[in-house]
């Protein structure tokens, strides 16, 4: 499932609109991830609190959205653009790749809640495809 030129334009446009609330979306998406999929808390055992809405979860959610925005800027070559993040997650953090898909789903839910009018079916498809390609790029070094 590759991204067409129209998909890329749609993603860039939507993320431009979303920039004012991206921190909130990142924090809420990660909060939902640890609440709905509690096994993901194991990656954050070193935090004082990995509870939904806690300060460390919010901070890391913001960091994640920063990475997603970086990926939007590298949308034409995600695998090459995200190679260092792939290495980090594969070799140092040892994140199970399935978690990228789970987080992507939580992001979609949050985006649709915060931007119900802008999150049209066309935007949904384009952003879903983008997040799937992003997850695939992050898995590059797992092979």
Curated annotation (Swiss-Prot):
Residues with PTM N-acetylserine: 2
In this protein, which residues make up the domain named Globin?
2-143
Pfam families xrefs: Globin
Q: Which GO terms describe its biological process?
A: hydrogen peroxide catabolic process
Stored InterPro entries: Globin (IPR000971), Globin-like_sf (IPR009050), Globin/Proto (IPR012292), Hemoglobin_a-typ (IPR002338), Hemoglobin_oxygen_transport (IPR050056), Hemoglobin_pi (IPR002339)
Q: What does this protein do?
A: Involved in oxygen transport from gills to the various peripheral tissues.
Q: What family is this?
A: Belongs to the globin family.
Q: Write the protein's name.
A: Hemoglobin subunit alpha-1
User: Which species does the entry assign this protein to?
Assistant: Boreogadus saida (Polar cod)
Gene field:
hba1
